[in-house]
Regions:
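A structural motif
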Residues: 100-108
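Solvent-exposed, acidic/flexible segments
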Residues: 2, 29-33, 56, 60, ...
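Secondary-structure end/capping motifs
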Residues: 121-184
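Bilobed "Venus flytrap"/periplasmic-binding protein-like clamshell domains
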Residues: 7-87, 105-106
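Glycine-rich beta-alpha junction loops
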Residues: 80-81, 103, 155, 170
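A bilobed periplasmic-binding-protein/Venus flytrap-type ligand-binding module shared by bacterial periplasmic
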Residues: 6-16, 108-124
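Ligand-binding "clamshell"
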Residues: 1, 48, 84-100
Length: 184
């Protein structure tokens, strides 16, 4: 499971009262993201599609541009956008008003899954995979700075780009334990 450090951004100075700030607004968030539509439903709205103008863009960059040009009030950014978002925050152009994981606690942007039949037919392989993942996570937690460099090299980016999300200990969490917040 990964809580992927996905910020919600707005123009600098925009009021934020929580998810209720979405009501009646245009937002660059795909309504299929239950962290948001579910949170709107938790406010008592039966159909979140009727009370928020959800705009879907082909990229997070386009969603960010929509905030900057006033087309939408709020936009969800992807994990990979943290470096650029932080630069815009530092310049005073935008601000981070929340994170997806603050809208719905423990909402995971990424989970590993396996088909039930394969899992049931391969118990030793599944156990070996879980052991390897737990060992890898243990190493990652003890060596985050080195992990940043390794990941940056793997994806062809600078360390600062990867550190912008991987070193955010408040919003970026990796947990490979299959029993933690499991989905059955």
């Amino acid at each position: 499971m990964v809580e992927g450090c996905m910020p919600v951004v707005a123009k600098a100075g925009t009021e934020w009262k929580g998810i209720e700030s979405f009501i009646g607004q245009s937002v660059a968030v795909n309504p299929s993201y239950f962290a948001f539509t579910g949170a709107v439903m938790d406010l008592g709205y039966d159909n979140p599609l009727d009370v928020v103008d959800w705009k879907v863009y082909s990229s997070y960059d386009d969603a960010l541009a929509a905030v900057q040009n006033g087309e939408v009030k709020y936009a969800l950014m992807g994990t990979q956008n943290n470096y650029g978002v932080k630069q815009l925050v530092d310049s005073g152009d935008i601000e981070i008003v929340s994170y997806q994981s603050e809208i719905m606690e423990n909402y995971s942007c990424c989970r590993m899954v396996g088909q039930t039949k394969w899992v049931n037919d391969n118990p030793d392989t599944v156990k070996a995979i879980i052991r390897a993942l737990l060992r890898a996570q243990s190493w990652y937690e003890a060596n985050k700075e080195e992990a940043v460099s390794l990941h940056a090299k793997r994806i062809g980016q600078e360390d600062d780009y990867v550190a912008a999300y991987m070193m955010d200990d408040k919003h970026y969490f990796v947990n490979v334990d299959p029993l933690k917040n499991s989905v059955c």
